[in-house]
């Protein structure tokens, strides 16, 4: 059972990007599990940031709306891209490091 996750990046009240978790573009849709984690998928937050990068759109100052609490890797990418708020709907394997790094960078982490 795969979790379905979506992410919107919003800046100045406009959606600048969207992403959902899915297989790596151009690769076969096959499950490759290593260390109990799927290796062939890209997370929703990663896809949204990559979409901005491909189109030359800055994420600086944007808000991320995510269906689920972000993993630590996605959190680091969101923070490094300049996201200033992360809002999520559902708790999912909440990692305390996400709160820690958000706090270090004064990024609001808000459960909706």
Predicted regions and their residues:
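Zinc-dependent deaminase catalytic domain
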Residues: 1-112
